[in-house]
Amino acid sequence: MRMIETIGEQKSVEAATKQRKLELGRDWSGFPDYEAAKQGLRNYWYPVLWARELKQKKPKAIKLCGEKILLQRDSDGNPRALHDRCPHRGVRLSQGKQWWPNTVSCPYHGWTFDLRDGELKAVITDGPDSRMCGKAAVKTYPTEERIGLIWVYVGDEPAHPLQSQLLKNW
């Protein structure tokens, strides 16, 4: 994309932008978030699953913007999202189980991660006293439940409020 070099060209761009705003609603390309999406698709909240489909103790695997993600509810019923790979051997955590509240355990060697912060809480051979606890973790993603959907943010920047991306009445 080239830089605007003259004032005349700048006014022309401003006029086109103003016209585009007037056409809002006629096609999705005029919607402001779609224009901004050209700048970086990761820095948005995405609806990934119907809320009724996400259960406690039953991990769900999704892929969003190239990220493999595990979704699961914690013991309070809140949706949680973690990177879907165990840092030990790369096995998908979504194939594991929840043996203890607020955790998911890798099916390979039983490394157990907290759903809320991704921290390693126990190793099946040593339990919570393992020397690895506090040294390993999986990435977590901001997650919200709104209007019957589970929303996940995988952005590179800090998450903005989901409401700022939704229509006013949602």
Show the residue positions of the predicted features:
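Rieske [2Fe-2S] iron-sulfur-binding domain
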Residues: 50-170
